[in-house]
Amino acid sequence: NIYTLKYEGKLKPSSELKLHCQIYKTKPEIGAVIHTHQMFGSIVAAAQVDVQVLDENHQNILGGKVIKAAPYALPNTKKITMATAKAIENSNAALMSNHGVVCIGKDLEHVFDVARTLEKACELFIESKKAIA
């Protein structure tokens, strides 16, 4: 239950349960949330910068031209939960500074597509920064 944080069954929910529930509350139209530690997404998250999405197809899948980085906060805290929910307000993904990424979608297939696309967008973003350095 996203309001009481109570669950049924034998499997224990993720330690980021509050984060997942807050995103579902904030964006009731979605059907799936995933939190990953994918390589390029985590690199950009460690840099604590927003990702400029350079490819138009990536922009369509990610729901915007910029993927926001939530300010750093300790994992499993209200601060990181609220900061990440705010960072994902206008797109289908957000970076969790020094931690990883969160992606949302209408269903699991869609959210995995968002995660794959975010990884490609982060790789392109890193390459673009290297090219001008």
List each model region and its residues.
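Glycine-rich flexible loops
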Residues: 1-133
